[in-house]
């Protein structure tokens, strides 16, 4: 999976990420991965569900990976942050 098929979910409105996924799918890509960490995880789930239910009904959720990443802060302290990857595939 190339890096251009990955949509990183952050603090922007949900519809911005939905548009990014729909644009990639309409451009000929058959697979897109949504990646999010921390509080953006719920936004990533929202993006996947909006794309699946409203825009591209024949899209499938191929795989969901969850993990915990260790982030090193400015003071050198380690913080655990939850992360998710949602793999979407269009047949």
Curated annotation (Swiss-Prot):
Transmembrane segments: none annotated. It is found in: Cytoplasm; Chromosome. One of its GO terms (biological process) is chromosome condensation. Pfam families: Alba. Keywords: Chromosome, Cytoplasm, DNA condensation, DNA-binding. GO terms for cellular component: chromosome; cytoplasm. Its main location: cytoplasm. InterPro entries: Alba-like_dom_sf, DNA/RNA-bd_Alba, DNA/RNA-bd_Alba-like. Binds double-stranded DNA tightly but without sequence specificity. Involved in DNA compaction. NCBIfam families: DNA-binding protein Alba, PRK04015.1. This is DNA/RNA-binding protein Alba.
């Amino acid at each position: 999976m190339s890096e251009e098929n990955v949509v990183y979910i952050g603090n922007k409105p949900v519809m911005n990420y939905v548009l990014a996924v729909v644009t990639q799918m309409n451009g000929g890509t058959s697979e897109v991965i949504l990646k999010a960490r921390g509080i953006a995880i719920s936004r990533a789930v929202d993006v996947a569900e909006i794309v699946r239910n409203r825009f591209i009904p024949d899209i499938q959720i191929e795989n969901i990976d969850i993990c915990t990443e260790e982030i090193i802060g400015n003071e050198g302290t380690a913080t655990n942050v939850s992360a998710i990857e949602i793999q979407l595939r269009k047949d």
